[in-house]
Amino acid sequence: MTPLRKTNPLMKLINHSLVDLPAPSNISMWWNLGSLLGTCLVLQIVTGLFLAMHYTPDASMAFSSVAHITRDVNYGWVIRYLHANGASMFFICLFLHIGRGLYYGSFLYLETWNIGIILLLATMATAFMGYVLPWGQMSFWGATVITNLLSAVPYIGTDLVQWVWGGYSVDNATLTRFFTFHFILPFIITALVALHLLFLHETGSNNPLGISSQPDKITFHPYYTTKDILGLFLLLLTLMSLVLFSPDLLGDPDNYIQANPLSTPPHIKPEWYFLFAYAILRSVPNKLGGVLALLLSILILMTIPMLHTAKQQSMMFRPLSQLTYWLWAANLLTLTWIGGQPVSYPFITIGQVTSVLYFITILILVPTASLIENKMLKWT
């Protein structure tokens, strides 16, 4: 008798995606990140839903409603900190997932890669709007500074900012619309994830060697389901350790002070996962130039497939490319550190040098290293 999972239309769909999916036999733990990102997304939607039941998106009550969730709601503090730190885990997995794609040449699957970049932008937008909702000092001033960047758009900039704000400053209208978009975007992200998987399953997964996976495949279940469960346990262990032992480690103390338009915090900075882009923004003295550099720091990922000059897909056997890759990774960490530092010497200079290096590595060093390797291997 044929199993139900192979005959029922709905079960058949799940079966082809999670059970009988042909997967390369040699994919490493770096391929676990997709399932971890799915777990993070589900966790964020569930915890966010419970938070939305108790949160009040009103400028006069938002801060108090978050305090009420933390103090009075049954396990409200767990839900709140799971949601806040879950976002951090989401971005850690996201950055590692992109890093894996860059290292092993997964960007050559163009549709999957481009939808992935759209997913990154949508996730960043969602996280930014979520950071505004507690209506603390850093929420308010972060929203003011980042939305104000739209004023750099020539001619229509000022009107654009006031349109986003819903007034002449960040106020109740801004908070309400940010809550609305923060609520709806995760569901749009879920739809994009389905598209991402649809295109991935058209080509099949890449593998560490960067060679065809067709000759040697195994079923996703039980081999990779077991492997994914191990990754899941490690993720939950890290997340619960953060939530239960040090829930405010990645947050900002200023956000425990209610938003006050008349008092500016000494150092306005976004959440840690935006610091690299914030550092690039601050490194350019011109406002419009800074905004363009900020956008390009993410959108440059779309040019990676065009800059691929190597004859091999993966970096596994390309030592020069590996060197440039790890230089870029170290540079990214330096930018993250710089983004959290005050705007003073020597941080300004370090920020400018690392920002220039960020673009030079991607646009010049990696393609050049690949061409040299082609010559060395006599593959030209």
Swiss-Prot record:
Q: Which CDD domains match?
A: cytochrome_b_C, Cytochrome_b_N
* Gene Ontology molecular function terms on file: metal ion binding; ubiquinol-cytochrome-c reductase activity
Transit peptide among keywords? no
Copy out the cofactor comment.
Binds 2 heme b groups non-covalently.
Which residues, by range, are in coiled-coil regions? none
User: Per the UniProt record, which residue ranges are transmembrane?
Assistant: 33-53, 77-98, 113-133, 178-198, 226-246, 288-308, 320-340, 347-367
Question: Which PROSITE patterns does its entry note?
Answer: CYTB_CTER, CYTB_NTER
Chief subcellular location equals mitochondrion
| One GO term of the biological process aspect | mitochondrial electron transport, ubiquinol to cytochrome c
Membrane topology category? Multi-pass membrane protein
The UniProt record gives the binding positions of a ubiquinone as: H201
Q: Which keywords belong to this entry?
A: Electron transport, Heme, Iron, Membrane, Metal-binding, Mitochondrion, Mitochondrion inner membrane, Respiratory chain, Transmembrane, Transmembrane helix, Transport, Ubiquinone
Detail which positions bind heme b b566: H97, H196
Amino acids binding heme b b562: H83, H182
User: Which top-rank group of organisms is this from?
Assistant: Eukaryota
The cofactor named in the record is:
heme b
One term under GO cellular component: mitochondrial inner membrane
Where is the protein found, in the record's own terms? Mitochondrion inner membrane
* Entries under Pfam families matching the protein: Cytochrom_B_C, Cytochrome_B
UniProt subunit comment: The cytochrome bc1 complex contains 11 subunits: 3 respiratory subunits (MT-CYB, CYC1 and UQCRFS1), 2 core proteins (UQCRC1 and UQCRC2) and 6 low-molecular weight proteins (UQCRH/QCR6, UQCRB/QCR7, UQCRQ/QCR8, UQCR10/QCR9, UQCR11/QCR10 and a cleavage product of UQCRFS1). This cytochrome bc1 complex then forms a dimer.
The miscellaneous annotation reads: Heme 1 (or BL or b562) is low-potential and absorbs at about 562 nm, and heme 2 (or BH or b566) is high-potential and absorbs at about 566 nm.
Q: Report the protein's function.
A: Component of the ubiquinol-cytochrome c reductase complex (complex III or cytochrome b-c1 complex) that is part of the mitochondrial respiratory chain. The b-c1 complex mediates electron transfer from ubiquinol to cytochrome c. Contributes to the generation of a proton gradient across the mitochondrial membrane that is then used for ATP synthesis.
Give the UniProt family note.
Belongs to the cytochrome b family.
By what name is this protein known? Cytochrome b
